[in-house]
């Protein structure tokens, strides 16, 4: 009860009131319907959210193409773009190099620590979104611990869905909340910061997941958090599947675990948290992923997690405050780790991984510039860059 009371206090006192909503858009003239492609198109200066709303009302055209450029919030708010049940089944796809950012220095408070961010989350997936909803081909960046909104009312989620403090605080790049199970492909989540957790992605299924959020061919790079899950956080009772993803340069534990300190127990204070954190009653299914050059690899207190044909290599990056040894995997139940290559300062922090079905201290993978291992021993394991589909990468 003390912890719940404290979290309510965080939500009420540590975040500022709503100053404006990201719904305010006046550039909808850059959104058009392409009947031949059966898709809506958004050009630079246009409103992606307006296109999503149009597609939500349109029974025949459920694709939104966003053309090359950088898309910023037009106003302070809780998300640059958001998906709810009415948006289920829409594919939002980048055409060319498309950046979605939380930053807008023209309207941000340049004296605030969060400058130049003006939204809590770059992308929000809310209650009622299934795996038929697809986000593909974007770069997601710019979150910097900006937080607005309190309580149970939110412009990006139904009043009927309960809001935890982490609804507002976590998931600077992408927040996945309640019964939301999107499919996210070829997305690069880079350069985000949040406190306490989940700077790149925060998945919060509120304890009763009916499915898993799906990530394929994604990159998580240079994300930072005050406490846990620098790149990816699976909060209590959540599920995610990650296939062919890269984690590099992510740092957790930048400061004190202020939630743990005030509620009777810091989270993994000695060795800290990894690029990916899996909390109790959660499950991660990870295959053909690479974790390298992070503050730590993975910490997993979940149930039934699997890590298959993945690479954990030298996750010893400096930057956090935990004084214990850096580690590749810290997992309470290691039976699901198999056919993986593991090497670092501490390979298996808890000694729970079966060495007979994994390779400890393998040869140097000799990563190239895209983190593809050149050593032949690694031919069947780890991340490989996905070839961009012609539909999403050509000029239209």
Where are these regions (language model features)?
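N-terminal export signals
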Residues: 5-23
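Acidic Gly/Asp/Thr-rich repetitive segments characteristic of extracellular carbohydrate-active
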Residues: 32-67, 77, 82, 377-386
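Structural detector of coil-to-beta-strand junctions
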Residues: 80, 120-122, 146-147, 164, ...
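Extracellular beta-strand-rich solenoid/capping regions of secreted or surface-exposed proteins
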Residues: 49, 53-59, 72-93, 99-136, ...
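Right-handed parallel beta-helix
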Residues: 67, 96-97, 131-144, 181-193, ...
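Surface-exposed or flexible loop/turn and strand-edge residues in extracellular/cell-surface modules
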Residues: 37, 61, 68, 78, ...
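Acidic, glycine- and Ser/Thr-rich low-complexity intrinsically disordered tracts
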Residues: 27-35, 107-113, 117, 306-308, ...
